[in-house]
Design a protein with these regions (language model features):
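Rossmann-fold NAD(P) dinucleotide-binding segment
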Residues: 197, 208-224
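Glycine-rich Rossmann-fold phosphate-binding loop(s) that bind the pyrophosphate
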Residues: 141-142
């Protein structure tokens, strides 16, 4: 019987890669790969994510194949986890050989999920936002918001941010982490204030209880909307009129 080895990338290895190459550089590189994948979208064998919803959160499986390899990602989303000392999101992924069904690659994907989410946002903004976009409003300043900011700067050159969160401590953490990297950050006291001069509005929230983060009246013509928190029932973020 043929010997078989499954390659494995753990949390430490993923962190070393990010530290070596930098979040912005990684996201910019991901955008190139994602653009090629979206061009081949119709050729992938795929189904919508399989989700299990509970009062605590959601656990999802995301399978796809190109008939050469098959892969899936496991990811959860539990908004109340930080209060209990856990991460909101954890993830891992498996790649297999379609020819023999053997797994060939297993990877920790919690950090990779954060990078990929930001890369998709940056890729879409690259093609749909106005080319002269220079200011972004960020509604919700949890951990993903920092990846969003770094990705938008790497791909679009945006460094002026107006941010709002219902938790002042989250805003302060965002500023503490990103201002030393050269971002110009205005801590707004309301959503209205944050979006007033925005070319791009990113909503980046996790709590199902806040179903309407952004109202139609707050969106000016020509603004690009990047709503990434509305990923399951009850998390719409945008008013229906939008």
């Amino acid at each position: 019987m043929t010997d078989h080895r499954v390659e494995f990338v753990d949390v430490a290895s993923m962190a070393q890669w990010i530290q070596r190459d930098g979040v912005g550089n990684i996201i910019a590189g991901m955008v190139n790969f994602l653009e090629e994948d979206f061009k081949k979208w119709q050729s992938f064998d795929k189904i919508p994510r399989v989700a299990s919803h509970t009062p605590f959160g959601v656990i999802e499986l995301m399978p796809t194949s190109d008939n050469i390899t098959y892969s899936f990602k496991y990811v959860n989303g539990h908004p109340s986890n930080p209060a209990r000392g856990y991460q909101t999101v954890t993830a891992f992924g498996l790649l297999t050989d379609v020819d023999n069904g053997y797994p060939v690659f297993l990877a920790e994907m919690t950090l990779l999920t954060a990078l990929r989410t930001a890369a998709v946002s940056a890729m879409v903004a690259k093609h749909l936002a106005r080319k002269d976009s220079r200011k972004m409003a960020m509604i919700g300043t949890g951990s993903q918001s920092e990846f969003q900011a770094l990705g938008m700067r790497a791909v679009l050159g945006i460094e002026d941010l107006a941010v709002y969160d219902v938790d002042p401590a989250a805003i302060e953490k965002f500023r503490r982490n990103l201002e030393p990297l050269g971002f110009r950050i205005h801590a707004a006291s309301s959503v209205d204030e944050a979006v007033a001069d925005a070319d791009i509005i990113t909503t980046c929230t996790a709590d199902k209880q806040q179903a309407k983060v952004l109202l139609n009246s707050q969106v000016k013509p020509g603004v690009h909307l990047n709503a990434i928190g509305g990923d399951c029932p009850g998390k719409t973020e945008l008013e229906s009129e939008i």
